[in-house]
A protein has these predicted regions:
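Pyridoxal 5′-phosphate
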Residues: 1-280
């Protein structure tokens, strides 16, 4: 925003949570668009909110925002490889994401992007790089930039080959497993973990993530009853005992059973570890 000469204090409208644990309802999004839609150029939201794990309805948001003349983009860092994403059918104008979370490409790996086909040949402001130039004439080094049809035309330079290698293997695994099947297992895994936490760790942990499976992915964000210091102590204990989660300030532990390689036994092992910590 600053790069384009705008002051975020004046040009940015931030949605405020209207539900517990920082969750944002569709009603809140609709209210913001009704109030400000005529002066909003871009609606930019996550597919899944990184801290609390809330998943957003891409198609519903896009449809609503388009009625107000807004361009719509999504940050899918925590959604890609986690939820089935029908980006074209959602109508979103564009989306961006990384591959080092659920898609297992490792830190620093190349990112990904989607641009809806209705913008494929549009003359739009862009950072134009030689790798986005028409492949048939790319090496002629002509004076005019001729973009490749579609999202490839937004590429700047050639991708890092070594970081593509693990991504190629991972994407092949996802292709063979199938996102529909992975989502079905994910619903069962995270649902099982939720049930274990609620039935065996009541009074120790509280769940921040929406309880509706349609409003979340694999991730469960949890807080430890008793405050931040106890939460951090539990997180460190889990890490020391080989259970890898993630800590997000001020007081959230993120646990994400990944259906490609996590088992139901892993969910049970997490709960048993928390029990051991709570009673030691």
């Amino acid at each position: 925003m600053r790069f384009h000469g705008f002051d975020p204090a004046e040009a940015l409208i931030e949605l405020e949570a209207d539900e517990p644990n920082g969750l944002i309802s569709m009603a809140a999004i609709e209210r913001a668009l009704t109030e400000h839609g005529s002066r909003i150029a871009l609606v930019m939201l996550p597919g899944i909110q990184y801290r609390n794990g809330q998943a957003f309805d891409l198609k519903a948001i896009t449809t609503l925002a388009h009625r107000h003349g807004c361009t719509v983009g999504f940050d899918l860092a925590h959604a890609v490889g986690n939820l089935p994403l029908q980006l074209h059918d959602s109508g979103a104008d564009f989306a961006i994401w990384c591959h080092y979370k659920y898609l297992n490409a490792g830190p620093g790996a190349v990112g990904g992007a989607f641009v809806h086909e209705r913008h494929a040949d549009a003359v739009l402001p862009r950072f134009a790089g030689w790798w986005g130039h028409d492949k048939a004439t790319r090496f002629q080094m002509g004076p005019e930039f001729v973009p490749i049809h579609g999202v490839e035309g937004w590429q700047l330079s050639n991708p890092p080959i070594l970081s593509l290698a693990p991504l190629r293997v991972s994407l092949d695994m996802f292709r063979r497993a199938g996102m529909r099947q992975l989502r079905e297992k994910s619903l069962q895994l995270t649902g099982y973990l939720e049930w274990l936490v609620k039935t065996q760790l009541a009074g120790v942990l509280e769940i921040v993530t929406p309880t509706d499976p349609n409003r979340r992915g694999a991730q469960l964000s949890i807080r430890v009853v008793g405050g931040r210091d106890r939460g951090r102590a539990l997180f460190d204990y889990l890490m020391d005992h080989g259970i890898i989660g993630d800590w997000r300030e001020p007081d959230v532990i993120r646990i994400s059973p990944a259906p490609l390689y996590n088992r139901f036994a892993d969910c049970l092992a997490f709960v048993e570890a928390v029990k051991n910590w709570a009673t030691k």
